[in-house]
Amino acid sequence: MIQAPRIALIAGEASGDHLGAGLIQQLRLRLPTAEFVGIGGDMMRSARCQTWFDTSELAVMGLTEVLRHLPRLLKIRREFCKRALAWHPDVLIGIDAPDFNLTVERWFKQRHIRTVHYVSPSIWAWREKRAAKIGASVDRVLCLFPMEPPIYARYGIDARFVGHPMADEIPYQTDRATARTALGLPLLSPVLAVLPGSRHSEISQLGSTFLEAAGQLSEHLPGLHVVIPAANTQCKPLLAEQLSRSTLPVMHSHLLDNSARTAMLAADVVLVASGTATLEAMLLKRPMVVAYKVAPLTYRIVKTLKLLKINRFALPNILAGEDLAPELIQKDCTAPALCAALLDWFKHPQKVTALQNRYLQLHTQLRRNASTRAAEAITELLPQR
């Protein structure tokens, strides 16, 4: 009797649960009898993956939080490894969450079980030599960005560009009017989306400055509506407090619950913290101004030790190899500077049209049916039965 393929997965974050579910669906098309177990959330369970632990049990951020939860995390890792090894998987797939997954992947690879890491760490931005450590842990890396496999190739590591799932989800042409109707916004008024990040530390650094810039912008654009989507319930009170101290007109300020994509769709221009949200804004074809601040000591350490290997911070600019979106970092991230950069987009629609054409090219480059390609790359590693 031929044994069904056995595939173990670890999704350490909500985004990984989403990726894992899409991957499982595509693997089932190729391997109808395959069995799936691991660490996941509701989406992976909906794809009929038996989860031994929930994704939320691994989702901790920040050094102090990790240290506080370290005994529990180590216990989960031990129990997962013991149980999965006894189950005899044909392949182990770690999805993102490299701090947890790479150690587990290496442990299984040392026991001659195939391992895959889905979503490369940002080795193109800093600590490129991590590629060698990653290669010691996995048989194959599945990359979301085209500039990543050539870096791994320098270290003799098998890496495949599969495309970005977000580029598959978002259509090439988007509907601003429907988004505005959903949010109760006027169809013809100027709209700015403000996204100062999803972490408390980011919002503390950027939120007030972003809202001050929006307040200054409203003086230049009468009738401006500002939408501020709170990424989660934890950060909403801080945003509400910052908004109450801002100069924004109350009637035209809209603090939303977890509606980032709808907010960006509804907007003419987006003011956004550097991170994944910049990629989403690009795929939605929205002009943006990108900003970021970290603690001064952290910034000095990064600059002094030359830890960053890139001259650009925003993902659209990195992908394009040119400055498509203004970047205002550290001391340059001031309300007047942000306001001026935002106003430039509002006042020059011809620049917006040219930008949208360039964003469409990048969207096309990233849209590769990521889950399908990832499933193909994993199927190749399975033993022939």
Swiss-Prot record:
Coiled coil: none annotated. SUPFAM superfamilies: UDP-Glycosyltransferase/glycogen phosphorylase. One of its GO terms (molecular function) is phospholipid binding. It comes from the Bacteria. Its EC number is 2.4.1.182. Transmembrane segments: none annotated. It is an enzyme of class 2 (transferase). InterPro entries: Glyco_trans_19 (IPR003835). Pfam families: LpxB. Keywords: Glycosyltransferase, Lipid A biosynthesis, Lipid biosynthesis, Lipid metabolism, Transferase. One of its GO terms (biological process) is lipid A biosynthetic process. Belongs to the LpxB family. HAMAP family: LpxB. NCBIfam families: lpxB (TIGR00215). This is Lipid-A-disaccharide synthase. The lineage of its organism: Bacteria, Pseudomonadati, Pseudomonadota, Gammaproteobacteria, Lysobacterales.
